[in-house]
Amino acid sequence: MWYNNQLTQSLNIQYPIIQAGMAGSTTAELVATVSNKGGLGCIGAGYFTTKKLEQEIQKVQGLTSQPFGVNLFVPSHQSYTNEQVEHMNAWLKPYRKALNLEEPVVNISEEQQFKSAIQTVIKYRVPVCCFTFGIPSKEIIEQLKGAKITLIGTATTVDEAIANEHAGMDIVVAQGSEAGGHRGSFLTTNNQREPLIGTMSLIPQIVDHVSIPVVAAGGVMDGRGILASQILGAQGVQMGTAFLTTEESGANQLVKQAVLHSKETDTIVTDVFSGKSARGINNEFVETMKQYEGNIPPYPVQNQLTNSIRKTAASTGHREWTHMWSGQSPRLATSQHVNQLMDRLVEQVKTLLTVVR
């Protein structure tokens, strides 16, 4: 069976399909439905307060008895200067004025928020905990493993995958450059540039260098992508954009429609929205902010500075001023219920296997 392997056994799920964290766009209904249909639904908790995370976990637990996960951002510890913030506030002033917004106060509480989230995951016995932007400390990994929680890391290079395995991750997601949303990169490359290795190149190279199960992410939207990923050596897939446009997704309708009506040439990788590289649909804000390249405050500072602009723009229909995360396969996105998407994915793989045989 294409779905019976080390990955599905480790996660105690039927199908090797993981719904990506998609911070800010997941709902309890989305997560629970994916899990109820045999995949692994994940709460995108990167921006959650402890109270919000507790509420979401309880909602999901009330909707499913199947395994699910919580996706967390590992604190980045990036330094920044007050001058950077002052300059960015000056550059963002026209947007705030147009949207009638006040200048925000930067409040960095990443570390405290992350540690609190870990304790919440343990308290509520969440079966799986996923990480991006790095690897948590040895102490945190030991705490989670002591609670019998399965750990999933993220890698955009072979070295990052090896680091995840050495740290004690049970599974690693190989995130190709096609993936929508934030890049999970955390190790510096020889040329000091953000690694942008495509899924087809990344998967087999990571598979050859680690012994833990590898999950393919980036551009996977249907049964063809699932089967192709397995042929490359991945034991499963992580899908974001495919779930982003479903009825149960918490993404703004403006974003959903933008993805559904975009082409493969419409996405770019930019750090202007959050201070960390992410793939999304190009727009006026990205083009305007390009002139400040090299002067963007790091995540999470830039994320806080642009947060109210992005949220207000999205809620008032200003698609040119908000982030619209999407992978490179928007033409394959569909608007349907999650259970329909899951059924379609499974049927597509079955049909393809019949043809191949």
UniProtKB/Swiss-Prot annotation:
EC number(s) for this protein?
A: 1.13.12.-
Q: Write out the similarity annotation.
A: Belongs to the nitronate monooxygenase family. NMO class I subfamily.
Q: From what superkingdom does this record's organism come?
A: Bacteria
Which note does the record give on the cofactor? Binds 1 FMN per subunit.
What Gene3D superfamilies has UniProt attached to this entry? Aldolase class I (3.20.20.70)
Report keywords, A-Z: Detoxification, Flavoprotein, FMN, Monooxygenase, Nucleotide-binding, Oxidoreductase
Protein name (database record): Probable nitronate monooxygenase
Asked if the record carries the keyword Nucleotide-binding, the reply is yes
Reactions listed under catalytic activity: 3 propionate 3-nitronate + 3 O2 + H2O = 3 3-oxopropanoate + 2 nitrate + nitrite + H2O2 + 3 H(+)
Q: Identify which top EC class this enzyme belongs to.
A: oxidoreductase
Q: Which organism is it from?
A: Staphylococcus haemolyticus (strain JCSC1435)
Q: What does this protein do?
A: Nitronate monooxygenase that uses molecular oxygen to catalyze the oxidative denitrification of alkyl nitronates. Acts on propionate 3-nitronate (P3N), the presumed physiological substrate. Probably functions in the detoxification of P3N, a metabolic poison produced by plants and fungi as a defense mechanism.
Q: Which residues are recorded as binding FMN?
A: 71, 175, 180, 219, 238-241
| InterPro entries per the UniProt record, alphabetical | Aldolase_TIM (IPR013785), NMO (IPR004136)
Q: What is the lineage of its organism?
A: Bacteria, Bacillati, Bacillota, Bacilli, Bacillales
Q: Which GO terms describe its biological process?
A: response to toxic substance
**UniProt cofactor(s):** FMN
Q: Which GO terms describe its molecular function?
A: nitronate monooxygenase activity; nucleotide binding
The remark listed among the other comments is: P3N is a potent irreversible inhibitor of the key enzyme succinate dehydrogenase in the Krebs cycle and electron transport chain. P3N has been shown to be a toxic metabolite to bacteria, plants, fungi, mammals or any organism that uses succinate dehydrogenase.
